[in-house]
Amino acid sequence: MAKPIPKVGSRRNGRSSARKSARRIPKGVIHVQASFNNTIVTVTDVRGRVISWSSAGTCGFKGTRRGTPFAAQTAAGNAIRAVVDQGMQRAEVMIKGPGLGRDAALRAIRRSGILLSFVRDVTPMPHNGCRPPKKRRV
């Protein structure tokens, strides 16, 4: 009979050691994507690796409430709370999209105590690219 291969660490108990320990991140980039339906806040380090993220949907808002300014404020607060614990003091903010949550997310970021080096609007603007969808008739 073949000898069983000894398990070094199963998936269940080896999970905690596989997770990276929280490293100190003094400076980062906060990306806010505000669409009409949702607001997504992603916090990365300066190299672009994601540290934390949150959206209005993951904060418990469903349906049309995801696009509200209050939902964006809650999502920004959740994403930033994790990185403040890791020692982030300075950040750059990139805001993308036309949604209602742009200003509310920025206000929540300002209130968190992180110093903002700059705020940049990176909304993609077409130079007469694709034809836009037809206007809604309600």
Swiss-Prot record:
<keyword id="KW-0687">Ribonucleoprotein</keyword>
<dbReference type="GO" id="GO:0019843">
    <property type="term" value="F:rRNA binding"/>
</dbReference>
<dbReference type="GO" id="GO:1990904">
    <property type="term" value="C:ribonucleoprotein complex"/>
</dbReference>
<dbReference type="InterPro" id="IPR036967">
    <property type="entry name" value="Ribosomal_uS11_sf"/>
</dbReference>
<keyword id="KW-0694">RNA-binding</keyword>
<feature type="compositionally biased region" description="Basic residues">
    <location>
        <begin position="9"/>
        <end position="24"/>
    </location>
</feature>
<keyword id="KW-0699">rRNA-binding</keyword>
<keyword id="KW-0150">Chloroplast</keyword>
<dbReference type="GO" id="GO:0005840">
    <property type="term" value="C:ribosome"/>
</dbReference>
<dbReference type="InterPro" id="IPR001971">
    <property type="entry name" value="Ribosomal_uS11"/>
</dbReference>
<protein>
    <recommendedName>
        <fullName>Small ribosomal subunit protein uS11c</fullName>
    </recommendedName>
</protein>
<comment type="similarity">
    <text>Belongs to the universal ribosomal protein uS11 family.</text>
</comment>
<dbReference type="GO" id="GO:0006412">
    <property type="term" value="P:translation"/>
</dbReference>
<dbReference type="InterPro" id="IPR018102">
    <property type="entry name" value="Ribosomal_uS11_CS"/>
</dbReference>
<keyword id="KW-0689">Ribosomal protein</keyword>
<dbReference type="GO" id="GO:0003735">
    <property type="term" value="F:structural constituent of ribosome"/>
</dbReference>
<comment type="subunit">
    <text>Part of the 30S ribosomal subunit.</text>
</comment>
<dbReference type="Pfam" id="PF00411">
    <property type="entry name" value="Ribosomal_S11"/>
</dbReference>
<keyword id="KW-0934">Plastid</keyword>
<dbReference type="InterPro" id="IPR019981">
    <property type="entry name" value="Ribosomal_uS11_bac-type"/>
</dbReference>
<dbReference type="GO" id="GO:0009507">
    <property type="term" value="C:chloroplast"/>
</dbReference>
<feature type="region of interest" description="Disordered">
    <location>
        <begin position="1"/>
        <end position="24"/>
    </location>
</feature>
